[in-house]
């Protein structure tokens, strides 16, 4: 049983979009984030959950992605307008932690050719996994553009040591219905991951990058 109503979410989405439309135009696309505060959860003792959800509409169309590819996928990446690195490029990093950290910070997500994915831990160590950015595999038969869109549309709820999470659920260019739907889908999915469902939810807030927070719960 959901504790938030569609109409309540819609009211807040209206306010959020109104604020964004009426304030100074930003020179970037503002992301709309769902910020979650948990309660009655002990990250030390309770199972730390992790789950991914593919949203119907991509929340961050300009999310930066890099492809670790063989020659075939490096070529395909260029035609998709996505950055790519070959095995030689990865070897040049020489397992240098600073350089790998810089790479991990530069991109929001990574995709790797299936043939390379097993080499990633050997070439780059555990850094990408620790940052929650281990590459998504892609095969030569997959549509690479579709895979990039999938990665951009997938959000991840992962409990670490602190009891708050934030995920991108949309952007301020979306229409009201789309944004409401994406928020409700994300909330329901998150609640399904929690041990005691709604009893573990302390607060739910939506916020655009530069706008104020609107409380849903």
UniProtKB/Swiss-Prot annotation:
Q: Which family does it belong to?
A: Belongs to the universal ribosomal protein uL1 family.
Q: Does the keyword Cell cycle apply?
A: no
- PANTHER family, alphabetically? RIBOSOMAL PROTEIN L7AE FAMILY MEMBER
Ribosomal protein as UniProt keyword: yes
User: What Pfam families does the record point to?
Assistant: Ribosomal_L1 (PF00687)
Its GO CC terms are: large ribosomal subunit
Q: Which InterPro entries match?
A: eL8/uL1-like, Ribosomal_uL1, Ribosomal_uL1-like, Ribosomal_uL1/biogenesis, Ribosomal_uL1_3-a/b-sand, Ribosomal_uL1_CS
Protein name in UniProt: Large ribosomal subunit protein uL1
Q: Which CDD domains match?
A: Ribosomal_L1 (cd00403)
Task: Give an example GO molecular function.
Answer: structural constituent of ribosome
SUPFAM superfamilies, sorted: Ribosomal protein L1 (SSF56808)
PROSITE patterns linked: RIBOSOMAL_L1 (PS01199)
Q: Which GO terms describe its biological process?
A: ribosome biogenesis; translation
Keywords, A to Z?
A: Ribonucleoprotein, Ribosomal protein
């Amino acid at each position: 049983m959901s504790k938030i109503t569609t109409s309540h979410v819609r009211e807040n989405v209206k306010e959020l979009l109104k604020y964004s439309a009426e304030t100074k135009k930003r020179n970037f696309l503002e992301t709309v984030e769902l910020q979650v505060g948990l309660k009655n959860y002990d990250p030390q003792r309770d199972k730390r959950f992790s789950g991914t959800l593919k949203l119907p509409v991509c929340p961050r169309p300009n999310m930066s992605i890099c492809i670790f590819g063989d020659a075939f996928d490096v070529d395909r990446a260029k035609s998709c307008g996505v950055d790519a690195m070959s095995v030689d490029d990865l070897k040049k990093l020489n397992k240098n932690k600073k350089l790998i950290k810089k790479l991990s910070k530069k991109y929001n997500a990574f995709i790797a050719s299936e043939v390379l994915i097993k080499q990633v831990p050997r070439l780059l160590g555990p850094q990408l996994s620790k940052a929650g950015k281990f590459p998504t595999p892609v095969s030569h038969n997959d549509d690479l553009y579709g895979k990039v869109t999938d990665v951009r549309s997938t959000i991840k709820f992962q409990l670490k040591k602190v009891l708050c999470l934030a995920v991108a659920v949309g952007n301020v260019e979306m229409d009201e219905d789309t944004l409401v739907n994406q928020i409700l889908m994300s909330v329901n999915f998150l609640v399904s991951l929690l041990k005691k469902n709604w009893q573990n939810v302390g607060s739910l807030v939506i916020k655009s990058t530069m706008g104020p927070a609107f409380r849903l719960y």
